Amino acid sequence: RGLGDVYKRQIYRGGAVIFRGTEKCTLRDCYIHHVGGNGVFFDKYNRNSAVTGSYLTSIGASAICFVGDVAGVRSPSFRYGEFVPLDKMDTAKGSQNDNHPAYCEVYDNLICTIGLFEKQITGVELSMCRNITVSHNSIYDTPRAGINISEGTWGGHIIEYNDIFNTVKETGDHGTINSWGRDRFWHPNYNVMTQITDENPALILADVVEPIIIRHNRLRCDRGWDIDLDDGSSNYQIYNNLCLNGGIKLREGFYRTVENNIIVNNTLHPHLWFKNSGDVFSRNIVMTKYKPIRVYGWGREVDYNIFTDSLSYLAARQLGGDAHSIVAAIRFIDAAKGDFNVADDSEAIIKGGFRNFPMNNFGVLSFHLKQLAESPVMPVPLVAGHVTDTKTMLWKGVTFKNLDTLEERSATGMDTERGVYVVSVDALGSPVRDFIAPNDVVLGINRKSVNKLSDMKEALKRADTQKEVEFIIFRNQKEHKVVIPL
């Protein structure tokens, strides 16, 4: 299903250097610059080939791409709203052919100032490929992700020891390391997808047949998430990462194990979790409250974490998890210089089970690339305090608020932070429960634009004397006109 090249975007299968049908070929110690399109493109069949020790800068599109043959994807869909009916779906595991990159490597490269012309690009693109290792790269100054995993087809990647920052500079709803799932089980309607996965659990890992590992990276995103697993991304192992600003988001999906990460000044962002997701979030250093959106179950285990303040810990306990988690005063060894390890005698290690990991091994290794490579700005660690309550509005059993957070924008698929977000609907007492649903966004009432709560209040005042009111609601990535009788 994945189709990263034709699904989320169209991609040009070309570049300054093209690998096609290669085995054991390496681009080593090269300088690729001032290229109008892609830098290096691995197209379809490639095995055990690599890009190492190179400097890629001033690139018009993506720096390095691995993109397999669409014909290898079983039961593909090509647009967001499309879905292959289950009775017509090929349910076999894995690829239909071997016409894709596999067992290739991107090692010790400096990638910066890319996406000069195209914006839906990335430093390293992985689409319809398997077992690609991306390690010891420094990637920064990008309009979108530093590393993008377009879909689950077909997993087995290892992403490690990279230094990635200054990303998502010209777009939004994205991450420094980003993934789109959208494998065969995925459906744009969450309720339909829930039914599919309940009845056909074997489909969950039919495309991502091997786990994808994200470990030992230093990541910073100031306009999104440090790690963003979107749209049902499944079968991930995420551990020993230093997340400097944006936190970790897991939307939909199954079998994500997130352990022993340091999440500076941020937290876990669980979006639309399934009741039986199999997710694990454990032994992480967490510095703010969890930010859940429409979580229907808390996975296999959300517990044994280390919170840096009691407010965040108590909020987590109220959600029903973290029974064995602790609150500990965290003193990083030298945060200003990038050492976010904690003392060996700290409570995080003695009671919380956290394990320090190396802080001096991120990014490029070659001497000449180290001399050129920049480093991220180190954050000042903050302890969370009381936050003023968000303003809400209650109308006919429906609770509304301004859509004003990145989390709400991502969960709804909105283009910007605008409109009025539906927080909850009283399933028994609301007379409009058949018309408005949680996670809807109200964009208009009676042909008047609604950008914030005050707009909505004014529009509803005028509608009080009418027999019906017309809402424009954004739901499942589309605007809908809904007429509600009063």
Regions found by a protein language model. Give the residues of each.
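PDZ/PDZ-like domain segments forming the peptide/carboxylate-binding groove
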Residues: 399-444, 448-451
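Right-handed parallel beta-helix
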Residues: 23-37, 46-61, 73-92, 96-115, ...
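Acidic, glycine- and Ser/Thr-rich low-complexity intrinsically disordered tracts
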Residues: 73, 175-176, 180-193, 276-399
